[in-house]
Amino acid sequence: MTSSESTATDSPRKGLTAALESSQPRRRSFTDYRRFIQNHYDGLPGALTAVTGLLTGHEALAGRLIRPGAFDVRGCKRILDAACGNGRYSRFLLRHADADAILTTFDLSPRMLTRARARLKSERVSHAVADLTRLPYADASFDAIVCGWVLEHLPDPRLGLRELARVLQPGGKLLLLSTEDTLTGAMCSRLWHCRTYNRVELRQISAECGLRWEREMWFSGMHRLLKLGGIIVEMRRASLPDSHSA
């Protein structure tokens, strides 16, 4: 299966949430869709992520996920912020990581990387334009990874999860955030032209890719109660994924 033409293999969506979801991922080939998404984030929608993050509370809530007692990166020396966007999670990684830790970031959108550089202004960070399905890093390069709100831009999550598992060292930790197949998730899908994932199915697929769910996390107790905020989970790399698995 190639990243350019692969299609989703999970269960078909039904009902109101399916009707509300963006049709862009289904209407376009992956090559065309990837170009569309890059242009989307290079443009005004990407520039507005700083504003929308404030309005939705995601800017402040990000700090509740990346900190001691939550996704703790103390002791991690090589950290990757996958599809870093405007640097929302990078700034908390820098705040809580050891002083000698190195942060690597990438994004498909060159303009988002420019915004992240302007925001972070740190010599401890390196930036690169890269594709989650073809990461330019060696096996087991990182002991911690944050991957926020990018997996839903792939037709099949395995394309990204296998690469994340490959570059994560055995026992390394991954914080994954992804849009869920709920009503609010479908509304976000329409806004950002992405798909959604079912929580149970994504857990099973993660295991196929060598990633073991450790714990599900939430922005707040209210998010947990109302099942809001999407899928947020801390995982560990168990072993090398089988490239021939389904």
Positions of PLM-derived features:
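Conserved class I S-adenosyl-L-methionine
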Residues: E5-D72, R88, F92, M112-R115
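Class I SAM-dependent methyltransferase SAM/SAH-binding core
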Residues: L80-A82, N86-R134
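A conserved beta-strand element that flanks and buttresses the S-adenosyl-L-methionine
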Residues: V146
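Short catalytic micro-motifs in class I SAM-dependent methyltransferases
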Residues: W149-V150
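A short glycine-rich, Lys/Arg-flanked "PGG" loop and its adjoining helix->strand segment in the class I
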Residues: R158-P170
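Conserved beta-strand signature within the Rossmann-like core of class I S-adenosyl-L-methionine
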Residues: G172-S178
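Acceptor-substrate binding/catalytic loop of class I
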Residues: A186-E201
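Conserved S-adenosyl-L-methionine
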Residues: L211-M222
